[in-house]
Amino acid sequence: MRYLELGCISKTNKLFQKLQDLNPLLNIEIEAYSCKSSRRQRGRFVEKPLGYLLSALELRFPDYDFCGESWGSFRRKTLAEVLNEMTYSISTTHKNSDDVKEFVGFLEVILHRSVSLGGCEIFSYENRMGPFEDCLWYFSFLFFNKKQRRVVMLNAFMSRS
């Protein structure tokens, strides 16, 4: 797998950085990866969708080892569930519900531009250990589009301090 530089994601991450400057405990980012396996990844015998999800996590969080992870660390989600979870989590940091709804709607548009949501399988990474163990809340959604051979990862978390 390799990181994909997509214009809409780069611009969105710059906007997220401005939000993080206002609230340093909040971290939100989107990244896209191609699903072309490297030689090292081809040597592993892991189901393809799971292998792609784990590879994306490894690229984003190189300090953590995801080799022992299985399907038990992931949950399938619908787009409605993802949007509800994002709305709930972000509303804990920003009380204006209209702003939160607008923000989540903006994220949905960016995700749709990055990876066609209609053809996606959506997974949530559920393991509290590793990169998210010291967070008040977090979500890590992985959008896998087999046809586009792409994984888009949306991570957000609120640090404790």
From Swiss-Prot:
Source taxon at top rank: Eukaryota
UniProt GO BP: negative regulation of transcription by RNA polymerase III
GO molecular function, one term: RNA polymerase III core binding
InterPro entries the UniProt entry points to: Maf1, Maf1_sf
Gene3D superfamilies according to UniProt: Repressor of RNA polymerase III transcription Maf1
GO cellular component terms listed in the entry, alphabetical order: nucleus
PANTHER family xref list: REPRESSOR OF RNA POLYMERASE III TRANSCRIPTION MAF1, REPRESSOR OF RNA POLYMERASE III TRANSCRIPTION MAF1 HOMOLOG
Listed name of the protein: Uncharacterized protein ECU10_0060/ECU11_2080i
Species this protein is from: Encephalitozoon cuniculi (strain GB-M1)
Lineage: Eukaryota, Fungi, Fungi incertae sedis, Microsporidia, Unikaryonidae
